[in-house]
Swiss-Prot record:
The name this protein goes by in its record: Large ribosomal subunit protein uL2
Coiled coil: none
GO cellular component: cytosolic large ribosomal subunit
UniProt family annotation: Belongs to the universal ribosomal protein uL2 family.
Self-association state and partner proteins as the record states: Part of the 50S ribosomal subunit. Forms a bridge to the 30S subunit in the 70S ribosome.
Region (Disordered): 200-238
Gene3D superfamilies xref list: 2.30.30.30, Nucleic acid-binding proteins (2.40.50.140), Ribosomal protein L2, domain 3 (4.10.950.10)
SUPFAM superfamilies: Nucleic acid-binding proteins (SSF50249), Translation proteins SH3-like domain (SSF50104)
Molecular function via GO: rRNA binding; structural constituent of ribosome
């Protein structure tokens, strides 16, 4: 009898395939606080599963929150949070107060969502215009996005931009990179497996050895390859 496919095991939802959220130090998002407050960076730490350093900020009312550290941020640095904050590196501002050309990161779409855009290492967005109660920002993908003028953003560029340039050097480093996010690695081709493990496995050489097209109504253990394909291969002519 054959074994379950990888996607069947993942769909069951065992701990092997679940993201280890218990390793995280907390949610990295803005607190839902109104008004203007002054805070201090009390520490810069690593959050497992993230490629950006995380700053722990304590506001004058005692609230602590986690946010992406930006380039140039240091421990014990004073930052300002909320409406009316000056446009200075590390401050959390209402994006409606930012003039055109301001570089921001960790941008909310609407007030209170905690931050949605330009959050990864080395990324930033640029304020390019304003229209009514919306502010237009240019994302790292060069797409123009309209966000609420009440949305909050951090002035500056997210730290850790060189993380993709650092070589992994060995497979063990790549293993742990995927392990902390519960992503399956390495990905093994079906034709490289034994016949008991996959419908494309087995044989004296690596070949599907049977039609790779499969019915839409095929059972889960058979549903691999070209699913309900109208056609396969290159088009002839033209």
């Amino acid at each position: 009898m054959g074994k379950n496919l990888l996607q069947q095991r993942a769909g069951k939802g065992s701990p092997t395939f679940r993201s280890p959220s218990w390793l995280r130090i907390g949610k990295v998002r803005y607190p839902n606080i109104f008004g203007h407050l002054v805070g201090k960076v009390i520490d810069i730490v690593h959050n497992p599963g993230m490629n950006t350093p995380v700053a722990i900020i304590k506001l004058e009312n005692g609230t602590k929150f986690l946010t992406q550290a930006i380039q140039g941020l240091v421990i014990n640095q004073k930052i300002e949070f909320g409406k009316g904050s000056p446009i200075a590196n590390g401050n959390v501002i209402e994006i409606g107060d930012a003039p055109e050309g301001t570089i921001v990161c960790n941008v909310e779409e609407n007030f209170g969502d905690g931050g949605k855009y330009a959050r990864s290492a080395g990324s930033y967005a640029v304020v390019v215009g304003k229209s009514g109660d919306k502010v237009l920002i240019k994302l790292p993908s060069d797409k123009i996005k309209a966000v609420s003028n009440k949305a909050r953003a951090t002035v500056g560029v997210v730290a850790g931009g060189g993380v993709v340039e650092k070589p992994l050097l060995k497979a063990g480093a790549n293993y742990w990179k995927y392990k902390v996010k519960a992503k399956k690695w390495p990905i093994v081709r079906g034709v490289a497996m034994n016949v008991v493990d996959h419908p494309h496995g087995g044989g004296l050489h690596q070949s599907v050895s049977r039609p790779s097209t499969v019915s839409r109504n095929a059972p889960p253990g058979r549903k691999v390859g070209h699913i309900a394909a109208r056609r396969t291969g290159r088009k002839e002519g033209k």
